[in-house]
């Protein structure tokens, strides 16, 4: 499959479109044919070497979020079916024609939401959720004052 990789860190000029092996899902994983991905700050930091690839591959496939169509499901996956439209987040490897992720890392794309729009949702919304609910302890019925809602996270 084709993927955008970096073999050295730097600006956009280090991005290379190349052939890499197709990923193979494990029993609890899904294989998604990526229709769209998004570019966010973490991607640019990873490209520059300031946000290392946690999987430590010989080449880094960038991209933290995706939207696409389910192509294969692992043997123990019951929540998804081939053909489902999903969006999700992964620790890299989304700038590729296919991505493998744990079944819990994917969300269904609501009817009426285009794949291109869905690709820009996971990273920023999960970042906002983590900040407000996980880190900040926000619960139902409580309020939070957000002084600045800038960048992609501000859209959430």
Give the residues covered by each predicted segment.
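NAD(P)H-binding Rossmann-fold N-terminus in SDR/SDR-like oxidoreductases
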Residues: 152
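Exposed loop/turn and edge beta-strand positions of beta-sandwich/beta-sheet ligand-binding modules
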Residues: 16, 28, 64, 103, ...
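Residues forming the Rossmann-fold NAD(P)(H) cofactor-binding site
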Residues: 155
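NAD(P)H dinucleotide-binding glycine-rich loop of Rossmann-like/cofactor-binding domains
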Residues: 45, 79, 85-149
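Cytochrome P450 core scaffold surrounding the K-helix E-X-X-R motif
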Residues: 41-48
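Glycine-rich beta-strand-centered segment in the early N-terminal region that forms part
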Residues: 21-38, 50-93
């Amino acid at each position: 499959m084709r993927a955008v990789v970096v073999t050295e860190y730097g600006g956009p000029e280090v991005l290379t479109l190349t052939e890499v092996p197709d990923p193979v899902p494990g029993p609890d994983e899904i294989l998604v044919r990526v229709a769209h991905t998004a570019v966010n700050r973490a991607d640019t930091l990873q490209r520059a070497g300031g946000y290392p690839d946690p999987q430590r591959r010989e080449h880094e496939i960038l991209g933290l979020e995706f939207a696409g169509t389910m192509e294969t499901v692992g043997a123990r996956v019951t929540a998804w079916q081939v053909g489902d439209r999903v969006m999700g987040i992964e620790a890299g490897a989304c700038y590729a024609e296919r991505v493998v992720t744990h079944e819990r890392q994917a969300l269904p794309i609501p009817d009426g939401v285009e794949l291109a729009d869905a690709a820009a949702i996971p990273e920023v919304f999960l970042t906002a959720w983590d900040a407000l609910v996980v880190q900040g302890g926000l619960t139902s019925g409580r309020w939070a004052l957000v002084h600045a809602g800038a960048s992609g996270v501000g859209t959430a």
